[in-house]
Amino acid sequence: MLKYNIHFSIGFFIFVLSAMPAMSADIVNDKSIGMELARDIATEAVLACRKKGYNVSAVVVDRFALMRAALRDDLASRFTLKIAKRKANLTVMAWSDSGTFRKARPDIQQELNNINGLIVMEGGVKIVSGGYNIGAVGVSGAPGGDKDAACAKQALQKLQERIEFAIDN
């Protein structure tokens, strides 16, 4: 009887282990930007533009285009927040900086601009950590999307080491 129980226990244990890979597909682990890093990227982007004399807003979204941080400089227009978020959303949708996407796909720019939450303008930059797209930052308010993008990239450059090691591979 004891021999039967041991064999049954071993067999049951092997059955449970063999079922685990099939069950693992039911759980998805994602790698996305955390609140503190998002806050610091938004802050650095606004400060980078402020040093150049531009009053901007910066919005950081996670890989699902959910807002993680938003910051509007004291004299930035209130509309810059919405535009910055829409730029970041486009970046997440395309997984390409919004300026790069704008140049590559002028044929669908008008259609995308009519989708709620998106705008095809320069100023959205993807955030990559450990080879994973973890979010995007959108900046709006400088006189030109190229200047918005430069402030976003400057913020990412300043926090580059922290961003790169945010995800453990």
What are these regions (language model features)?
Residues 1-10:
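Bacterial N-terminal signal peptides that target proteins for export
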Residues 24-169:
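Flexible, solvent-exposed loop/hinge segments and secondary-structure transition points
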